[in-house]
Swiss-Prot record:
Organism: Photorhabdus laumondii subsp. laumondii (strain DSM 15139 / CIP 105565 / TT01) (Photorhabdus luminescens subsp. laumondii)
Pfam family, one: LigB
SUPFAM superfamilies listed in its UniProt record: LigB-like (SSF53213)
Gene (UniProt): mhpB
InterPro entries: DHPP/DHXA_dioxygenase (IPR023789), Xdiol_dOase_suB (IPR004183)
Protein name: 2,3-dihydroxyphenylpropionate/2,3-dihydroxicinnamic acid 1,2-dioxygenase
Record's catalysed reaction(s): 3-(2,3-dihydroxyphenyl)propanoate + O2 = (2Z,4E)-2-hydroxy-6-oxonona-2,4-dienedioate + H(+); (2E)-3-(2,3-dihydroxyphenyl)prop-2-enoate + O2 = (2Z,4E,7E)-2-hydroxy-6-oxonona-2,4,7-trienedioate + H(+)
Subunit structure: Homotetramer.
Assigned keywords, A-Z: Aromatic hydrocarbons catabolism, Dioxygenase, Iron, Oxidoreductase
GO biological process: 3-phenylpropionate catabolic process
Pathway stated in the Swiss-Prot or TrEMBL entry: Aromatic compound metabolism; 3-phenylpropanoate degradation
GO MF terms held by the record: 3-carboxyethylcatechol 2,3-dioxygenase activity; ferrous iron binding
Sequence similarity: Belongs to the LigB/MhpB extradiol dioxygenase family.
EC number(s) reported in the record: 1.13.11.16
Function in brief: Catalyzes the non-heme iron(II)-dependent oxidative cleavage of 2,3-dihydroxyphenylpropionic acid and 2,3-dihydroxicinnamic acid into 2-hydroxy-6-ketononadienedioate and 2-hydroxy-6-ketononatrienedioate, respectively.
């Protein structure tokens, strides 16, 4: 009945953008250090909370939350492709437990996940099959969004289920911190772009490449100081990290979509995934968190952060 948590930003521009060499080296070193910790811990179950970027979930049917019973990575940005190692019976038991807790999640037997899930799994676990993994999608991009309060309730319900299992559990939260990727918004784009947001599954290789080139160019523009998207916000990121590490779940639940958008940009909404993960951890009691890394990396369009935590009762055990 042990648990550990790691929350990390993700950025598809790692490997495509060009920050100072020392910056990228440091990021990869910290990921490797965390990967070694996971290897030593040898989790029997990973539960990952992550968003999607209109690669697997679309406006034709957009859930607030979805648990994958079976899941396949689409391989966007060449970051992991193929099936995840989902323990189906455990995933179904989790879904039933969430229903009993009043959390009406969607569930999928053909979930498509993108780099929001696969980048942390690849960097921390080396592949998508190494550990049994239950993916939990949180809608952080397709307005209207679930509230942060509801993300807390989801996380706590997941934590209550995991607390009853006799397994070494690793909680992963993926997303944020401040960043403002060029994600089209319904009502603000031409009909053909809206159609891609509604039903854009399985795009052609050319269409995916065109979309990725656009994101790369925005990263280059931001690095040149051309704020064609909202700038990164280190002050907001730092305060968020302080709150996460303090254990103030109530404060996290009070964050609003509008406030996050002003301070953290469109991509800042992904902190719901961190919120759910920390809320799940809080079920185990008081926790101690460690801030491993933070740097605003314009070339990657990301306030890049990595944090780990575990219950104080398990430290040194």
């Amino acid at each position: 009945m042990t648990v550990k948590l790691i929350c990390t930003s993700h950025t598809p521009l790692m490997g495509f953008g060009s920050p100072p060499e020392a910056t990228e080296k440091h990021v990869r070193q910290v990921f490797q250090q965390l990967a070694e910790q996971i290897k030593d811990y040898d989790p029997q179950l990973i539960v990952i909370f992550a968003p999607d970027h209109f690669n697997g979930f679309f406006y034709d049917l957009m859930p607030a939350f979805c648990v994958g019973v079976r899941a396949n990575a689409v391989g966007d940005w060449d970051i992991g492709k193929g099936p995840l190692n989902v323990p189906e019976n455990t995933a179904k038991d989790l879904i039933s437990a969430l229903y009993d807790s009043g959390i009406d999640v969607a569930h999928s037997w053909r979930m498509q996940v993108d780099h929001g899930f696969t980048q942390p799994l690849m960097l921390l676990c080396q592949n998508l099959q190494r550990y049994p993994t239950i993916p939990i999608f949180i809608n952080c991009a397709a307005k209207p969004l679930p509230t942060c309060r509801r993300a807390v309730e989801l996380g706590r319900a997941v934590g209550q289920f995991l607390f009853t299992t006799d397994q070494r559990v690793l909680l992963l939260g993926s997303g944020g911190l401040s960043h403002d990727p060029p994600i089209p918004q319904m009502g603000q784009v031409p009909p053909e772009v809206e159609e891609g947001l509604i039903a854009g599954r399985n795009p052609t290789k050319e269409a995916r490449q065109k979309r990725q080139i656009r994101v790369i160019e925005v990263g280059k523009s931001l690095a040149r100081g051309e704020n064609i998207v909202a700038p990164l916000n280190p002050q907001w990121d730092d305060e968020l990290l302080r709150i996460f590490c303090s254990g103030d779940i109530r404060r996290l639940a009070s964050l609003t979509e509008g406030g996050i958008a002003i301070q953290g940009g469109k991509g800042g909404q992904e902190i719901r995934c961190w919120i759910a993960a920390f809320a799940a951890l809080s079920v185990y009691g008081e926790y101690k968190a460690q801030r491993h890394y933070y740097q605003p990396i314009k070339e990657w369009l990301a306030g890049m952060a990595m944090v780990s935590a575990q219950p104080v009762t398990q430290i040194g055990a």
